[in-house]
Amino acid sequence: MKYYLRWIILGALLILPACKGGDSDPPGMSGKASLSSRYEAAKAITNTAQRDQSLSVVAGDAAREGDATVVKKCIQSITASAAKDDAAFTSAVVLAKAEKGQEATEVARMITNTAQRDEALAKIAKGD
């Protein structure tokens, strides 16, 4: 069951940004301000599962924008270890593809599952 949940969350992180229509930032908000505001909103959610899912989405969006600071804050705030590891894995790979290798490595090191952490670090090292 945990295995399937990981893939569902990973799929949502990859698909959700493509589902957004139009301008993602509200009027008057820059990308970084919007990400910080979204992080604060997600962190304020009381339902743990919903909070973790929202933080995972914000982490993925922050990684796509190259904002490793927000990525790390989101990942540190996720309570479920599997969700945390999946968000860190996806974000690390996205940061690496955005040529943010050092930040990607720092995020990959946040993964607690050794096999998953090694896989992320290998992808970063190989440039995958």
Regions found by a protein language model. Name each.
Residues 15-128:
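Non-catalytic tandem-repeat scaffold regions and their flanking low-complexity/translocation tails
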Residues 1-17:
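Sec-dependent bacterial lipoprotein signal peptides
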